[in-house]
Amino acid sequence: MFPSLTSDPERPQLPDRDFESSISTSNADLDDLMLSTNGAPDGKLNGRAPSGTSNVTGESYAAAAAAAAAEANERDGKEDPNNGEKRYADAVADTDVDNTGRHDQWSYPELPITAHPKSIKTGSWRAGGIRFAPLRVPMRRRLQTAAVLFHCMSIATFVSAFWLICANPLAWPIIIIYLIHLALSTAGTNGNLTYRSEWVRSLKLWKLFTGYFPMKLHKTHELPTDRKYILGYHPHGIISHGAFAAFGTNALGFRELFPGITNTLLTLDSNFRLPFYRDYIMLHGLQSVSKESIWNLLSKGGPSNDGRGRAVTIVVGGARESLEAQPGSLRLILKSRKGFVKMALRTGADLVPVIGFGENDLYDQLSPKTHPLVHRIQMIFLKVFKFTVPALHGRGVLNYDVGLMPYRRPVNIVIGRPIRVDKAHGPQPGQQDIDELHERYVQEIEKLWDAYKDQFAADRKAELEIFA
C-alpha cells in the first residue's frame, strides 16, 4: 500500500478548486487557507443544479406516471413469451424502478455545497525553486498535517516497531508466541469483527485527518437495514485515502448517515501478515478482500445473524488502477472486474456505486503514456509481487513542492443508489446474470459521475473513461 516512490520533475500542476468563486489557487496558497462550509440556500447550488438532475414539472410527472400505468396494464394483458419466467435483469428492473415509472426519468438529488478553501494572502517563501510554508500557521493545520503523516507512514512505523522489539532478547518468547498467532489467525477472514474498535475508529486523530484535505461523505439514498450491501469505491487513487476515511473510520459520519449498517473496508490479504500493522488495521474494522472473507461477512452477523445490516466496501480497480491515477481525470478498470458482482449474486447483496471525486488529485505521478518504459517495469512488478510501485510525488511536511504527503485538495465521496439483487443465486451464478448485473452497475457509475461531475470535478481535464 505504501511503496517506495520517485518524483516527477515535470509534474502537471492542478489548481485547487474554489467552488464559490471559481478562482484557482496554488498549492502554496491552499496550505495556509482556513476552511469554511457554506450551505446552498433553498437547496440550490449557486443557482444551478448538478448535471443529470431533471427539470420535469409536476404535471409532466403525472402524465408520465399515467402513461406508464397504461403501458403496464397493456403489458399485463399480454401473454409472457417466456411462460412467466423473466430474465434476472428484467426481474430486478421491475423491483428497482423509481416512482416515476421509468428508469430514464430518474435522476440523482441535489447535494449541498461542501467545505471548500477560501482565497487569502499567504506568507510562503521560496528557496532553490521550492516553496516553503510560513512559520506562522494555525496549530490546527499543523495537527492535520501530523495526522496525515502518521497514516501515510503507518506501515513503516508499526513494522519498524516490531523489529525494534525483536532487538531485545527478553522479548523473544513473546515475539515467538505472537508470530505463531500471526501465522494461524483467521481474524482477517472469519467475518467476526472481534478486533473492531469503535473507540479507535472515532479518535480525534481521524477528524484532523479528514480536515486536512478536506473530505466529505455525501448520501443520496437510504440503505435499509434489512438488506446487505457491497459498495464499490472508485477510483483507487494512489493510496485510497478517501475510502479509508469514509469506511475505515467514523470521521465522516457513515454510521450517522446510515444507522444500523455495519460497513467493513476490505484490503489485500497480505496486509494481515505484517506484524503489528495487521492489528492496527483490524482495530479499524478492516478485513481481507478474499472471497472467503466477503462470504463470511455477508452470510453471518447483523441483528438476524444472516448478514443483513452489514456492508463491505471494495476498492474495485485495485493496484493496477493506481497507475492510472492522474489529476483531473477518472480512468477506471471496471470492464474486466466482475468478481465483486459474482459475490453480490452469491450472497444476495445489493450493489452500491461510490465515487470519490478528487481522489486522483491528491498526488502527481508519471503518466503511462509519456513514460512507457517506467510503466512496463511497474506492470512486471505488479505481476510478480501482486502490488505496484507508483512513480509519484506530492508535497512535503514544511514545503509545497517536494515530498510524499498528499496535496490539500478536496475529496467528496458520493454514495450512489443501491442496485437491488433479488435473491442469493448460489455458489455459481450464471454468466448471463453476472454480465447483466455488471452492465447495470457500469451504467449506474456513469450516471453518478454525470450527476455530480460539474459540482465536484469542475476543473477536470477529461471525462470518465472505463478502459479495461
Outline where the language-model segments fall.
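Cytosol/nucleoplasm-facing, intrinsically disordered, low-complexity tails
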Residues: 1-118
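Soluble catalytic domains of membrane acyltransferases
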Residues: 2-6, 29, 201-204, 208-415, ...
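Membrane-anchoring hydrophobic helices of lipid-metabolizing enzymes
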Residues: 46, 73-292
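Catalytic cores of transferase enzymes with a strong primary signal for eukaryotic protein kinases
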Residues: 281, 407, 446, 450, ...
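Structured cytosolic regulatory/catalytic domains appended to multi-pass membrane proteins
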Residues: 307-311, 318-321, 438, 442, ...
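Pol beta-like nucleotidyltransferase catalytic core
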Residues: 411-414, 423-425, 433-449
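Charged, glycine-interspersed solvent-exposed loop segments at helix/strand-loop junctions
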Residues: 429-432, 459-461
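C-terminal helix/juxtamembrane-tail motif
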Residues: 454-468
